[in-house]
A protein has these predicted regions:
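Outer membrane beta-barrel transmembrane domains
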Residues: 94-135, 139, 143
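Flexible domain-boundary/linker segments
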Residues: 3, 144-145, 161
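Outer-membrane beta-barrel "beta-signal"
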Residues: 126-128, 153-165
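Short loop/turn motifs that connect adjacent beta-strands in outer-membrane beta-barrel proteins
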Residues: 7-16, 49-57, 87-97, 129-142, ...
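Short, exposed beta-strand-loop hairpins at the edges of beta-sheets
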Residues: 146-151
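Repeat-unit-sized solenoid/scaffold elements
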Residues: 77-100, 164
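Outer-membrane pore/translocation modules
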Residues: 1-85, 106-119, 158
Length: 165
């Protein structure tokens, strides 16, 4: 996936454009960008965080404007995804609550082959991050995230570390 993004000012909205490749290895020519042949999804996004210290809610709206996101007649679906994020801290642990939705019917096919027929909650998540002090000069940032997709009746638990220079 390739993404270019620009944030307007220090606290303004962020505009992004992405080329998403979900086809995997051996799925065709990565550099084929022809509308009805490409395996790319081209997506535009707009994100903004409310400038309210006690309510740092962010909202992002992304939609596919070209590429493989087609309906059964070969027309562009303009599939969209809207996500809300709310960061907060409890007892020294940084948390982030997420809720993502498909706002309308755009012919999106789920991994199980079902077509989404309208508004659907597709991402409910809670992520916890904590820096574990190893020495006076080094901390290990660890995280865990519980993710649930009610539309697909699917859940995941992710554990990880972040290494920064």
């Amino acid at each position: 996936d390739l993404t270019a993004a620009y944030t307007f000012g220090s606290a303004g909205p962020t505009l992004s454009v992405a080329s998403l490749w979900w086809a995997g290895q051996g799925a065709g020519d990565y550099f084929n960008f022809k509308s009805h042949e490409t395996a790319h999804h081209f997506e535009a996004g707009l994100a903004y965080t409310l400038p309210i210290e006690k309510l740092p809610l962010s909202i992002a709206w992304n939609f596919m404007f070209a590429g493989q996101d087609k309906d059964e007649n070969g027309n562009q679906n303009y599939s969209s995804y809207v996500e809300l994020n709310f960061p907060f801290t409890v007892k020294g642990v940084d948390l982030n609550a997420t809720c993502g939705v498909l706002p309308y019917d755009a012919g999106i096919t789920t991994y199980g082959g079902d077509v989404n027929s309208g508004f659907a909650v597709t991402n409910v998540a809670l992520k916890a991050t904590k820096d574990i002090k190893i020495t006076d000069s080094f901390s290990l940032p660890i995280f865990t995230q519980a993710i649930w997709n009610p539309r697909m009746e699917d859940a995941h638990l992710v554990l990880g570390i972040s290494l920064r220079p």
